[in-house]
């Protein structure tokens, strides 16, 4: 059993604070064997660059490039079709000439899977490649790459289907100029359906295609935005979902998850940021999830290691927001974003000076023990809206002077 702290990484802003890169740095520095996503779902986009290798993590934990196994907790969502595309991207990179023999080191040209078609609600079919990988290498003397990474998912995690995605996009489009800034991945619709009191599709159900088809039919029947669905299509989609799920996921029980946490060999990876919290953010521009450390702390307490928790608050030297909603002191800071661009659903990537009141609010709600401060290569200190203003940040555990893992330094 490890004796060092169990780190819970959460965002202090509106997302894009460097949570994934922080998880990668902590895993690599400490040799941690596991990462656990405890909130949010497949709508996350955590960018990690390790020695020039880039990947955007949505399904897999951000410690994957450093060799950590990926776990998903009971309060998360998963999308089997998106997951198999992401897995394929990693596998293509490993087999395409970029692998150097080290476990978990995909090609630097690997990219995250393409999102579902933004105009029609069509998902990439399970047999279609999600990204264009590196070309096959003519060098046949390379060692055989490791098998495709897999994800251990709690049996209670909710499953997003193409129907959730279609309804999500139709609902968001109908809002017109009042759009909320949805990611268009069906995450909110998946959570909302469960909150309505219906029995949702969960990871533990994914071994039975008939049960999956029944869930799809009931969801379509109950939706106010789906007129009709062909029964044959439902049967095919149920088989596709089951097949994709089996290729990526291994279902685990409460006991298995808590046993892993009890070893202390884990970094807990949060998604989104405090200012998007379902209860603490500014409605309606929020997510359907708690973005504080609460759910991770709860799991650690149930596993008997609650006293070892260390909360790591991730933030940039400046504030950002991807999509609609309030962003105090918004300004064009002249920052070039390599991996955050305007998208049809999330919207524009925006920047701002930090508002002292907002930052104090986030610190008060999250109560981080330490900070992971990124983009120190862009601004050498936290960029406040009022020059010289301070907010009393906790000690910096991880300082990032660039996007790569090698640009990050850990205190102590």
Please provide the spans of the model-predicted regions.
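Non-transmembrane, aqueous-exposed alpha-helical and coiled segments at domain scale
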Residues: 1-99, 141-412
């Amino acid at each position: 059993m490890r004796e060092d702290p169990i780190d819970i990484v959460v965002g202090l802003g509106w997302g894009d604070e460097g949570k994934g890169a922080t998880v990668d740095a902590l895993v690599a520095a400490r040799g941690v064997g596991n990462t656990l996503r405890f909130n949010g779902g497949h709508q996350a986009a955590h960018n990690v660059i390790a020695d020039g290798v880039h990947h955007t993590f949505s399904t897999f934990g951000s410690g994957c490039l450093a060799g950590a196994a990926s776990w998903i907790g009971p309060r998360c969502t998963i999308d089997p079709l998106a997951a198999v595309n992401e897995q394929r991207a990693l596998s293509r990179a490993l087999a395409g000439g970029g692998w150097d023999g080290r476990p978990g080191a995909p090609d630097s040209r690997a990219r995250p899977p393409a999102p579902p078609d933004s105009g029609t609600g069509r998902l990439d079919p399970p047999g279609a490649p999600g990204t264009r990988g590196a070309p096959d290498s003519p060098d046949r003397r390379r060692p055989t790459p490791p098998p495709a990474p897999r994800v251990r998912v709690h049996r209670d995690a909710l499953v997003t289907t193409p129907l959730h995605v279609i309804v999500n996009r139709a609902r968001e489009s109908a809002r017109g100029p009042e759009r909320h800034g949805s990611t268009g991945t069906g995450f909110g619709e998946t959570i909302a359906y469960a909150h309505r009191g219906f029995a949702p599709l969960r990871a533990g159900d994914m071994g039975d295609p008939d049960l999956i088809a029944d869930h799809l039919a009931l969801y379509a029947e109950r939706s106010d935005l789906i007129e009709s669905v062909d029964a044959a299509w439902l049967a095919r989609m149920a088989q596709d979902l089951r097949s994709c799920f089996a290729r990526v996921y291994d279902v685990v029980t409460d006991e298995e998850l808590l046993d892993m946490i009890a070893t202390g060999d884990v970094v807990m990876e949060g998604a989104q940021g405090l200012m998007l919290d379902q209860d603490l953010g500014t409605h309606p521009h929020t997510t359907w999830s708690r973005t504080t450390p609460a759910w991770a702390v709860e799991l650690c307490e149930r596993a008997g290691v609650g006293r070892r928790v260390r909360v790591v608050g991730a933030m940039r030297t400046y504030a950002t927001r991807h999509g609609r909603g309030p962003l105090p002191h918004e300004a064009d800071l002249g920052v070039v974003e390599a991996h955050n661009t305007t998208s049809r659903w999330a919207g524009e990537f925006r920047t701002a000076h930090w508002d002292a009141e907002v930052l104090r609010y986030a610190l008060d709600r999250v109560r981080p023990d330490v900070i992971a401060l990124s983009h120190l290569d862009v601004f050498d200190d936290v960029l406040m809206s009022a020059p010289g203003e301070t907010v009393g940040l906790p000690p910096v555990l991880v300082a990032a002077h660039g996007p790569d893992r090698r640009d990050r330094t850990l205190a102590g």
